[in-house]
């Protein structure tokens, strides 16, 4: 038997959508779990269960996006300590420094995950930041 096929047969894929996100009807899952890795979809700084962005700019939006990620991985039995990679997408690279301040505070008590950051335009809901994360499922 081909090893690649054997590996594919043993991979489990699970899709997770929170009750709050389910109400919004987005065409994607909050997270996809492949074996023991959680891939969290891009999160913006919206209030859970709404499309309303938190006010105050990049700092509060960053904190809220990370709290949204934390909520998702907590519901899956993991914690912020289990996050090992983040991808931050900014609508304006000039927000990099202020985003870093909020990001640093969020990960202050845990080991900081590896991260990539870039800027583009047209983020979902008009957000200033969107963050994807990968975490180990406990």
Q: For the regions a protein language model found, what residue spans apply to each?
A:
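N-terminal presequence-like segments and the immediate start of the first folded domain
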Residues: 1-67, 71-81, 90-138
């Amino acid at each position: 038997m081909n090893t690649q096929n054997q590996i594919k047969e043993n991979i489990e894929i699970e899709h997770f959508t929170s009750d709050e996100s389910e109400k919004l009807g987005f065409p994607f899952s909050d997270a996809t779990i492949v074996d023991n890795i959680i891939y969290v979809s891009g999160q913006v700084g919206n209030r859970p269960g709404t499309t309303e962005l938190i006010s105050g700019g990049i700092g509060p939006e960053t904190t809220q996006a990370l709290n949204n990620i934390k909520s998702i991985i907590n519901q899956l039995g993991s914690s912020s300590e289990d996050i090992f990679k983040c991808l931050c997408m900014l609508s304006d690279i000039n927000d990099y420094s202020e985003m870093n301040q909020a990001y640093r505070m969020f990960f202050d008590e845990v080991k900081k995950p590896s991260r990539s950051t870039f800027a583009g335009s047209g983020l979902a809901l008009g957000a200033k930041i969107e963050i994807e994360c990968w975490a180990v499922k406990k």
